[in-house]
Structures are given as structure tokens and as C-alpha cells.
Amino acid sequence: MGQSSLKLETIPLNDCHFSDAAPVGSVIPTESEVYDAVAQLWRQEPELERAGWEEWRARLKAIHPGWSLSVAHICRTLEKHCMSITGITQFTYHELVTSKESPALREPHLAKVQVTWSEKGKGLVARRPLAKGELVFAEDALSFIPPLEKSTLVHLSKACGSCGTSLSQNRYYYVMNNLDCDNCTTIWCTKGCRNLDTTHDFLKHPMSRNKRCSAQKWLKFEQFCKENTWHSAYSVGVMFARYYLHSDRRLQGNFESLAEVSQRVRLHAADTMNSGAAFDLGVDLTANAQSVCMWEEGYGLFCDAFPLAKDEYDLDFEKFLRYVGKFNLNQVNGQIYMLLSHLNHSCEPNIYYELEGHHINVYARKEIKSDEELTVSYVNPLHDVDLRRRELRVNWGFLCLCDRCKREISKKNIDKAGHSSTTAGPEPQSYRGHRRKSSLRASKPTLQDLLENGKEFDIEIPSQPGFAARRASVRFDSKVVTAVEERQ
């Protein structure tokens, strides 16, 4: 019987042999493939928004060398899907946004500010000079919306039925302090949270005989929203129940006075094949081609939960979509703050806010003069100008033309012109590796870069409640060493 031994052998990994790859230029991509490729590249590198058609074609060919792709093909595809590369014809909807005068703002909130109207709509200005760091105003949420994602934990008595906070005491503690429901498993963490949950009996107890609301069908609507990550419709339902079931005219008036636009319009701005969905800063994940069908089904469940609302409030499907769009336009961290919703945007804001639960504090970022407009940034001010403007266009319907945006656009155009004048000949092969990546990718290499170069880099592990954020390293190599048995 022969003896065997082990030897080390280096073998290729990650499909390094591409002999079976399609010949260059042999595949004509479909419109969907072109659109998806452009959308992905646009998300990764927003500065390409002002690139020419030939540059886009070169970038797409570099990523998909097997494609037979013409400029005309790219133009036709993007025009068909209402997507413009040049930025000249990008869809905006700010002129479709409407609002009304808020009927019941609390006087203490208006001590340092006052509401004004301009071509931009409602706004806030300072009544008197404000010092840097001064508290401008503070307010609670218009009507606190329980977190939809905590509904299962609430049902299991593991989280507060109002704010969703994890419950730390045993059940006996809550029973003794009258913080439990007599008819279901819901528990509240404090008496304040119990008092906030004014519609609990109507929405959570199937035995309720209220003609205006079917608790059993509300629970179906709630589950539907949870399954489809449709937080805005759920929030509209909670808000509507609060003023509808209690005839709360003040709450109704304040909610209906907020700026609104149909969610159908916002979906159009988000580009129906998902290029804009990645930028949607609302609370939903529903910006896709199947959204309308989901909306119709959800509206049907909403009407089942409130059988008289359609006639009593003329709440047809289009009005329901305007309510959903209203919530997405005005929400901050899943809540509505009345005075904060009056603030207009600036990429160089003069105020900022801090959240404490469902309470918000607004401070002066710098010294503010009397009668000066108060502005806040709707997006991350550290983002690149192209990314900021795209987020604003998709989520709030306008292309920002503030002084900062104009300066940065002008500088980019000058830099681009200077680069073009000093560049001769074809793009080098390392073009894609040396381009500045957008802030979305945080300058991390692509998967293809890793497989080709075997570089080591840090990847982020999502943080979990109660745990500090961690980092880990991962290495990709094109070859590995394996042990092979050799018989002698």
C-alpha cells in the first residue's frame, strides 16, 4: 500500500478566468437594464448628473463591456422614464404643493417667532434678535404616532403601547400602578403614555361596538401597513382616528393646514424604476412600480376600518394619497411638529433642532437678526451639492438655488472645464478606480475592485440597541492555498 503525503497548491478563486465572457459589444441591453445601470451609477456618483452623454456612455461601457450601447439608446430610455441627465428638464413639483393657515398654534411657541407668507409659502421669522445657541422654541409632536415596527412587542407586553419603549419591570409592577389594559395585553410605561393613547379602546378591542370604527378591520389595516413598510399610511390612520373618533376639530384643523401634495406626484419624482427611491427620506419603502396597486388595497382596508369616513369626510382615494404625501412632506423622525413644519430649507441654515423622545428643541445656529427668516436644512448639509439637490427634488419637489448651491455648482463647472482642457487622449484604464466616489459609498472600493486587487478594507457592522458600534476587517484575494493529497 503506497504512502500518501500532502502538498500545498495555489489555485485561482473568484472566477478569475473569463474565457467564457461575452465578446465586447455583442449584447444589446434592454431598456430596463440600461435604466437600472444608470440609476445605480447615479446613486453612487451624483456628480455625473452634469456629465455629457458620451461620458455616460463611456462609464456604462466600462461597467458592462459586453453591451452594444449608443447615445441614442440611452437618451430614448431615460426620456421614456422621465429621467434627465442634464438637469434641465428634471421633474419638480413644488408648484403643486399647497398649504393653509394653521388655525391653532400655541401662543407660548410664538414668543420669539412669527408666521409669514411669501412666494415660498409659509415660513417663520424672528420677532427679535436671537443669540447663537439660544432656544428659539420647543414643542411636542402634534399627536404622537406609536412606532409601527414595535406592534408585535406591544402585543406581547414587551413594549409600551404608546411610545414603544421596552418594558423593564415585571408585569406585577404595571398592574399595581394601573398601567395595563383590562381587555387586552397592552401595557404602558407611564401614566402619561396611557393618557396619550386616546384611541386604544376603539382600535385595539375587536369587541368594540363603535359604528365609526371596526377594531378588527383596523388591525388588518395595521398589519397590512407593517407587512408593506407603509409607515405614512399607518400614521395617517392613527392621526385620522384621533380627531375623527373624538371630534377633535383643533387637531383636524392643524393637520389639514400642513403643506400637502399627492404621494402619486412624489412617486413620479422618485423615478418609477427606483432611481429616486434610494434617496427618499420619507418613512416608507414603497416607491416602486407596484406602489399604486398596494395603495389601492391599503385604501380599501382603511375604508373598512372607518366605514363612515368616506361619506362624512369625502375621503376618496386621491384625498387619501394627499394625506399620505402630507405626512411624508412634514414628518421628522416619524412625527409631525406643527411649528417646525413651517420652516423653509437652506443649505446654510441658521437654526438646528434636537430630538428628545417625541419632544423637539430648536436652537439658533448663529446670531439671527430681527425679522430674519429662520431656516433649517432638510438634508445632510455635509453632502455634495448634487446629492443635496437630488434629495430635495425627490422628497420636497424643488431644485435648490441657494447661494451655497450656486457657488458649489459654479466651482464644479470651473473644475470640470479645467480638467477637460488639460486632458488629452482616451481615458486611462484606471479611470474608474480613481474617480471620486460619492458620500453614499464613503470612498469604499467596489466588489469588483476587491476581487481584482485583493485589497483589505474596513466594513461597518450595523449597530444594535445597547451595543457599541463595531468594525471588522475582511480581505478578498484572487488565489488561495489548498492542501492536495499526493500518493507515492
Swiss-Prot record:
Cell compartment(s), UniProt: Nucleus; Chromosome; Cytoplasm
Protein's GO biological process: methylation; telomere maintenance
Enzyme class: transferase
Region Disordered, annotated ranges: 415-445
Domain SET: 111-379
Cysteines paired by S-S bonds: none
GO molecular function list: histone methyltransferase activity; S-adenosylmethionine-dependent methyltransferase activity
GO cellular component entries: chromatin; cytoplasm; nucleus
Function of the molecule: Histone methyltransferase that monomethylates 'Lys-5', 'Lys-8' and 'Lys-12' of histone H4 (H4K5me1, H4K8me1 and H4K12me1, respectively), thereby controlling gene expression and remodeling chromatin structures.
Name of the protein this chain belongs to: Histone-lysine N-methyltransferase SET5
